[in-house]
Design a protein with these regions (language model features):
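Asp-based, Mg2+/Mn2+-dependent phosphohydrolase catalytic module
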Residues: 10-138
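Conserved phosphate-coupling serine/threonine residues in phosphotransfer and NTP-handling enzymes
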Residues: 2
């Protein structure tokens, strides 16, 4: 899920050297994108909806993770009961992200730590008490 348009998301993935074919279904990039809805939490809903259509298994919100670098990214997951992993690669540091996320990483340079975090993260409803709009810029 990203606030970017589908086409921009694909360009960003390709520019990072990522083979986007692994994220495609029927030739179309799979997920939730900015051109799906203006309300960002609805993008998570859309990504989950698409996953349910593509995968024949019973999926729950805990089968997904929202990864982002702002409290508002975490909010998108939390309103959908999806755990959020915050990464301090943007304007928010570790301290600015720890209270609004279910897990926080400084960056993705330690692949083993990153994957272990993704595998173990659990949604914690306490984070819904966080004031996501306080001191947040888009």
């Amino acid at each position: 899920m990203t606030g970017n348009l589908r086409e921009c998301a694909e360009m960003k993935l390709k520019s990072a050297g990522i083979n986007t074919d692994i994220f495609k279904r029927n030739g179309i990039l799979f997920g939730g994108f900015g051109n799906d809805h203006i309300d960002r939490p609805k993008l998570v809903e859309k990504a989950i909806e698409r996953a349910h259509l593509e995968i024949d298994e019973k999926l729950t919100p805990s089968d997904f993770i929202v990864i982002g670098d702002t409290p508002k990214d975490m909010h998108c997951g939390h309103v959908n009961n999806v755990p959020g992993v915050a990464v301090a690669t943007g304007i928010f540091d570790l301290n600015g992200l720890k209270d609004c996320s279910d897990a926080v990483l400084e960056d993705f340079t330690d692949i083993e730590k990153t994957l272990a975090t993704f595998r173990s993260v659990q949604y914690v409803s306490r984070s819904l008490d966080y004031d996501y709009d306080k001191n947040v810029t888009e």
